Regions:
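N-terminal Rossmann NAD(P)H-binding glycine-rich loop of SDR-like oxidoreductase domains
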Residues: 14-36
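Rossmann-fold scaffold of SDR-type NAD(P)-dependent oxidoreductases
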Residues: 19, 73-79, 124-125, 176
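NAD(P)H-binding glycine-rich loop region in Rossmannoid oxidoreductase-like domains
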Residues: 48-49, 54-107
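Conserved Rossmann-fold NAD(P)-dependent oxidoreductase catalytic core, especially the SDR/UDP-sugar
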Residues: 105-149
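NAD(P)-dependent short-chain dehydrogenase/reductase
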Residues: 165-174, 178-211
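A conserved structural motif in NAD(P)-dependent oxidoreductases
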Residues: 211-217
Length: 217
């Protein structure tokens, strides 16, 4: 849907600020929102222009975020976070995976609270890693506790920080997604490459579940 990024709409339904807007989900969501008549802005470490999208620079590590970014914003969609599959999970990388999600949410909340910004909603990404990686016949629901492993703890801290937006009387939503697949994405390309060569490798033990969700869902 990226061809819709420059599409105009005669009626603006609302204004949305997205963190992590340059990622797979962020790009697709931006196109969808624009096509539905929303104004979209991005928070990014780089202030590159992205079609009709306003891009504002921020730096969660240094606590840099101009409160003027929130002028006219109705909703925040928080997708920012270091890619969990991009590098080895060294001690430093694990710290980065957590802080890129948690500290960025802390900064958003601080600026919203300190400047009495009136939002209609805060939507935070999360992941099914909340439930752990062990194969199980159990059908998980929102009532299940987080797993006592790295991903479970990461998602728990991530969601706890998102829940703090409830303190500002803002409706808060957390979405636990599986691996998101889209035909042009690098993750999908890695899965398809051996298949195109006539090789069909077994993932893991071959017995574990491999949950996924398509980008359109």
């Amino acid at each position: 849907m990226e061809e819709n990024i420059n599409a105009e709409s005669s009626h603006v339904k609302g204004s949305v600020l997205i963190t992590g807007g340059s990622g797979l989900i962020g790009r697709y969501l931006t196109s969808l929102l624009l096509s539905e008549g929303y104004k979209v802005s991005h928070l990014s470490r780089k202030s590159n222009q992205f079609g009709r999208v306003r891009v504002f620079r921020w730096d969660p590590e240094k606590g840099i975020l101009d409160p003027n970014v929130f002028e006219g914003i109705d909703y925040i969609i928080h997708l920012a976070g270091a890619n969990i599959g991009e590098k080895r999970w060294t001690k430093a990388r694990k710290k980065e995976i957590i802080s890129s999600r948690v500290d960025s949410a802390k900064l958003l909340l601080k600026v919203v609270r300190d400047n009495t910004i009136d939002l209609k909603g805060f939507i935070s990404a999360s992941a099914i890693g909340y439930y752990g990686s062990l194969t199980s016949e159990h059908i998980y629901t929102e009532e299940d506790p987080p797993a006592a492993d790295f991903l479970g703890n990461t998602c728990r801290e991530w969601e706890e920080e998102a829940d703090r937006f409830n303190e500002t009387a803002v409706r808060t939503v957390k979405i636990r997604t599986a691996v998101v697949l889209e035909k042009s994405d690098s993750a999908m390309a890695k899965l398809l490459k051996p298949a195109k060569l006539g090789i069909f490798p077994v993932l893991g033990s071959g017995k574990q579940y491999m949950p996924w969700i398509h980008i359109e869902d």
